[in-house]
Curated annotation (Swiss-Prot):
PROSITE patterns: RIBOSOMAL_L13
InterPro entries: Ribosomal_uL13, Ribosomal_uL13_bac-type, Ribosomal_uL13_CS, Ribosomal_uL13_sf
Gene designation per UniProt: rplM
Function of the molecule: This protein is one of the early assembly proteins of the 50S ribosomal subunit, although it is not seen to bind rRNA by itself. It is important during the early stages of 50S assembly.
SUPFAM superfamilies: Ribosomal protein L13
A GO CC annotation given for this chain: cytosolic large ribosomal subunit
The protein's name: Large ribosomal subunit protein uL13
Length: 152
């Protein structure tokens, strides 16, 4: 406690925070801009008591992930790499082939790359649910549709 101002730092515990559910529609929006807004909510940066080393963020449902948009020639040229962990087992997919095989994967990969690495990031990624269509199975959570700050 500071003797001059009598300020005390308040530490919020993750168990005491009530997590809300938000729905974000990714249709006809740029992949990176949607991912930035999703990560901001997952990390809790929109809250006044944001702490970087704790999971104080909210849960996010992303719908229409298969209709996300890319700029330039990235639809044909952007590459995603994976490895089978065997010698010579490096595989690459373009955005087009990956989105045909797994429609939600490009958005999930973009979001996962923006989250912190380690146990905190894995826990935050579990708060994300991505659906390729316009319907989701989490209506019981009463999610709030989020429209703000998605188009810059």
């Amino acid at each position: 406690m500071n003797k001059i101002t009598n300020n005390v730092t308040i530490w919020i515990k993750p168990k005491t925070v009530e997590k809300k559910w938000y729905v974000i529609d990714a249709a006809d929006r740029v992949l990176g801009k949607v991912a930035v807004d999703v990560v901001r909510i997952l990390r809790g940066k929109h809250k006044a008591y944001y702490t970087p080393h704790q999971d104080l963020g909210d849960n996010v449902i992303v719908i229409n992930a298969s209709k996300v948009r890319l700029t330039g020639k990235k639809y044909q040229q952007k590459l995603y790499y994976r490895h089978s962990r065997y010698p010579g087992g490096l595989y690459s997919d373009t955005f087009r082939t990956l989105s045909e095989r797994k429609p939600c994967a490009p958005l999930e990969i973009a979001i996962k790359g923006m989250l912190p690495k380690g146990p905190l990031g894995r826990g935050l990624f579990r708060n994300l649910k991505v659906f390729s269509g316009s319907e989701h199975t989490l209506k019981a959570q009463n999610p709030v549709k989020l429209e703000a700050n998605l188009e810059r």
